[in-house]
Amino acid sequence: MVKIGFIHISSSSLRLVLAEIEEIGYFRVVDELKTPMKICYNLNNTCKVCNEKLHYIISTLKTYESLCLASGTSNIIAIATNSFNQICDNEIIVKSLKDNFDLDLRILTPKEEIYYNYLGIVKSLNVENSLVVEITGTSTNLTWVKDGNIEEWSVLPFGNINLTYNYGLNDRILSDSIDECNSFISNHLKDVDWLNNSFESIILIGDVGRNIAKIDKKRRRYPFDNFNNYELLDNEIHELYNMVKSKDLRQRRKIEGLEQDMADTIFTSLAIFHNISDLVSSRYIKISNHSLREGILYEFLDNNYDVIHDILDYSLYGILHSLNCNIDHANQVYKITLDLFNALKPLHHLDDNYLNILKTSSLLHDCGISINYLQHHKHSFYIILNSYINVLNHKELLMSAAIAASHRFNNYQIPVPQFSSIINKLDLKAIYELGALLKIAEGLDRSLVSSVKDVEVTLNDEEVIILLSSPLNLDVEIHQALRARDFFREVYDRDLIIRKK
């Protein structure tokens, strides 16, 4: 395992991300430090950073370097977004990084920013036809991603910082200023003719996306903190826009979920996105926590590691490796669960949309052992629920966690009331149906040596008969699997028969 540091200089902040990389190329963030700093706002009339601000930037970078050294980081990547080019004396910062830390600062072009945002997203989500929106301090980046490829892209010359201060929207918000700002945004959007196409969803990334998700989750009393792949509807964006525009700076600072350093720019952030969602024919909005930084990390991994290409498998096997789980057992339980799922389709009537849930729950069912074997099913529940697992939306993540937690032969109860805003009765039915199959599969590999080589299932009106092929004695496995018979009867209304062929 190695550690890598990532320093990111943007128009609104400096940020350090520390990540651990497993041998299989799986990374996980282990520390993150953000220093709010509206660099583009603090330029003086000659586009130079004032001495006080320059000293603060350099001292912050020294702190970042110290943190990297203390954590044993072996490699540091330093990048700056294109807004860095607005600083005419930026060579002072570049020279300081080189002289003090022996770091070469890479200043990205707009095209590179678009590409790395795209890479961060397609490595974490299945994107068929979406508009990707990033609102920075000085620009708005638009990317049309279709069938996993960049179809079109545009960079608009305004962001939340320059619009906020150009139109005096940092404190009290006057109606005339709102009208002028919205007119300016709308006119620029009309010049992007490819926005007239249809999109299945809009994916919002960056700090603006994270803050909108945090505000909306507080407003809805959302039951868990993970905001990657968080979903909203366009009318909810309009509600947030109308709520924020009625508040001055002091009142905005009290909005639950909003980071304090964005209180002055949150209105123009919403104004930009409000205009985009009005123009684009898509009701569905997703928030992605993966964007430019992750895109650069993925490129680094692809160049230096043999990375798993399936993005769901990348997450699942990465978690298995990092938690030192028994991967052979996980694979065997998944194989048997999948065989049972396919054989019992005439009974459960679940389609292939549940396959990602089945894979996640069966592969990660024992991940809680990394905390403690006792009650490990409960540990598995919250590990899965709080993990960033590619592809899965929040309902799928919750269902996967609940199914994994039900793999043992006990009376574990899913905390339904807490998550009633996410899952419904049909989801609960599917959880029980898949949970019953996982219980059987867990029992059929109780010896942890993949004894069962093949599973053959026959159905009738009263029974489900499972015939097992194996060169080994299966008495223990059959006994353990049959501990699920009462639950199976309750869920499938059939008696469970298991025997060796």
Predicted regions and their residues:
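Conserved beta-strand core positions
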Residues: 5, 14, 76-77, 131, ...
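Short flexible coil/turn linkers enriched for glycine and charged/polar residues
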Residues: 10-13, 70-73, 99, 136-138, ...
